[in-house]
């Protein structure tokens, strides 16, 4: 994919990494950078914070690999159809992925919870990409795959609760090249 407009978002961040054997654990804290016009005058945005813990365990039985993660997001000035308020959103996720002979698979489930002003946040996403690859001789290969994504949405813009999944920092055309809208009601 080529890079889309308004895609880059720089962050000031700190990250700790632990790697041993088949385990990889990363913890981080980040804030988006507010870009100013002069040289060396950019600062961290005090209104937004992003933090998390991401763990990967590779080479489990049955050629499985497993990701488990927690992501946190705080936005003091979040704007949705329900209005403007402080948003604190937590995401718990798991991803199972791997390859067995010619079959490859990638299954991911995420659940979000938190607060938006006086309302509650409850949202989810489920994504899968499963494929089968045929060798056509030499370096040529043909892969057939099925990709399915399900994202929760909000059904009542008049209540204070949010049920729309927030992808935090999606690429411009997250769903497809033809998508006319994004994933959340902003």
Regions found by a protein language model. Give the residues of each.
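Signature for the C-terminal beta-barrel architecture of outer-membrane proteins
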Residues: 2-161
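Flexible glycine-rich, low-complexity coil/linker segments exposed to the extracellular/periplasmic environment
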Residues: 157-186
């Amino acid at each position: 994919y080529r890079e889309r407009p308004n895609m880059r978002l720089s962050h000031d961040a700190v990250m700790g990494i632990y790697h041993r054997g088949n385990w990889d654990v990363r913890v981080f804290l980040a804030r988006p950078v507010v870009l100013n016009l002069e040289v060396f005058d950019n600062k961290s945005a005090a209104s937004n914070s992003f933090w998390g813990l991401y763990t990967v365990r590779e080479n489990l039985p049955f050629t499985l690999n497993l990701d488990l993660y927690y992501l946190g997001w705080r936005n003091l000035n979040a704007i949705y159809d329900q209005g403007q308020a402080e948003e604190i959103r937590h995401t718990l996720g798991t991803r199972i992925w791997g390859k067995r002979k010619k079959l490859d698979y990638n299954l991911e489930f995420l659940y979000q919870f938190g607060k938006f002003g006086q309302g509650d946040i409850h949202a989810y996403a489920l994504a899968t990409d499963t494929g089968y690859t045929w060798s056509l001789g030499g370096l040529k290969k043909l892969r057939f795959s099925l990709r399915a994504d399900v994202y929760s949405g909000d059904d009542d813009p008049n209540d204070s609760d949010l049920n729309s999944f927030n992808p935090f920092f999606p690429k411009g055309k997250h769903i497809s090249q033809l998508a006319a809208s994004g994933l959340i009601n902003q």
